[in-house]
């Protein structure tokens, strides 16, 4: 999908870019039976307190019901459309099974309209097909990966993401994957995945350009703690541009930041990680 750049007619448009959806999408209206109402919570809980900062309502939109399980085995499906989904960075495709059942799936790179895809235990290694990890050869790039059998995919679902199969363990119970983050981990061999890489990989190259586009997405501004009052943040207060007045940076709730690990120590999946993700190096 090509990137469209704008002329610098205003300050907000000077560095703005967007994806040219006319190059790849089929332009069909979304299927009403596969949409549902999406309620906006704007980061609040049932009592109205902010539980997640920097979240707003954004544009009104409906949620597309995407099939992350792909459990209709050995029934061929035809790809009918390639559509935009406002709720995720990846595009989606409408597929129609031979028995007439319709569903949305994540659009993998290289899939075309009228292509035939299928799910099952021993289906072909072809873009868009879904099968257990134990039946996928080494070196294959996959996406839409489950962590528990029949639990639905939760890994490699965003635009341009994928994982690569490195091998299988000695007893065949686990398959070793290398994720996009650089993390190497084991996944149960019975879990399913889809062949290919998630499409719309140019999504990360888009320059938002102005704050208003983020507000449409439901992203509110991020304010520095040192610009707040002392009753709002541990870094707040002081006359003019003062230091934070602490030995180390603090979170808004008074805990130390930039140091302590934030991952839960009692997660059962931690023991399946062979090598952690690559650390970012700030230049």
Swiss-Prot record:
What are the GO cellular component annotations? large ribosomal subunit
Gene Ontology biological process: cytoplasmic translation
Instruction: Enumerate the Pfam families for this protein.
Output: Ribosomal_L2, Ribosomal_L2_C
Q: Which InterPro entries match?
A: NA-bd_OB-fold (IPR012340), Rib_uL2_dom2 (IPR014722), Ribosomal_uL2 (IPR002171), Ribosomal_uL2_bac/org-type (IPR005880), Ribosomal_uL2_C (IPR022669), Ribosomal_uL2_CS (IPR022671), Ribosomal_uL2_dom3 (IPR014726), Ribosomal_uL2_RNA-bd_dom (IPR022666)
Return one GO MF term: rRNA binding
Quaternary assembly: Part of the 50S ribosomal subunit. Forms a bridge to the 30S subunit in the 70S ribosome.
Instruction: Outline what the protein does.
Output: One of the primary rRNA binding proteins. Required for association of the 30S and 50S subunits to form the 70S ribosome, for tRNA binding and peptide bond formation. It has been suggested to have peptidyltransferase activity; this is somewhat controversial. Makes several contacts with the 16S rRNA in the 70S ribosome.
Q: Which family does it belong to?
A: Belongs to the universal ribosomal protein uL2 family.
Give the protein name, as stated in the record.
Large ribosomal subunit protein uL2
Instruction: Report the source organism.
Output: Mycoplasma mobile (strain ATCC 43663 / 163K / NCTC 11711)
């Amino acid at each position: 999908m090509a990137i469209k750049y704008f002329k610098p007619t205003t300050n907000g448009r000077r560095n703005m870019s967007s994806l040219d959806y006319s190059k790849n999408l089929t332009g069909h209206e979304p299927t009403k039976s596969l949409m549902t109402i999406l309620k906006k919570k704007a980061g609040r809980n049932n009592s109205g307190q902010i539980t997640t900062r920097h979240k707003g309502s954004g544009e009104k939109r409906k949620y597309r019901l995407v099939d992350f399980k792909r459990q209709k085995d050995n029934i061929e499906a035809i790809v009918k459309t390639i559509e935009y989904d406002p709720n995720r960075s990846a595009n989606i495709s409408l597929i129609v099974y031979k028995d007439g059942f319709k569903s949305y799936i994540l659009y993998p790179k290289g899939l075309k309209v009228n292509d035939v895809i299928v799910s099952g235990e021993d289906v072909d290694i072809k873009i868009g097909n879904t099968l257990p990890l134990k039946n996928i050869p080494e070196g294959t790039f996959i996406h839409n990966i489950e962590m528990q059998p029949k639990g639905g995919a939760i890994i490699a679902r965003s635009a341009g993401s994928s994982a690569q199969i490195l091998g299988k363990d000695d007893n065949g119970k686990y398959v070793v994957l290398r994720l996009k983050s650089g993390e190497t981990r084991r996944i149960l061999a019975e879990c399913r995945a889809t062949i290919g890489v998630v499409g719309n990989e140019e999504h990360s190259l888009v320059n938002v350009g102005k704050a208003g586009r983020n507000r449409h997405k439901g992203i509110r501004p991020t304010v520095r703690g040192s610009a707040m009052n002392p009753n709002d943040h541990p870094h707040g207060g002081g006359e003019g541009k003062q230091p934070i007045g602490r030995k180390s940076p603090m979170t808004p709730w008074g805990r130390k930041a930039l140091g302590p690990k934030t991952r839960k120590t009692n997660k059962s999946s931690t023991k399946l990680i062979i090598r952690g993700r690559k650390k970012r190096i700030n230049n």
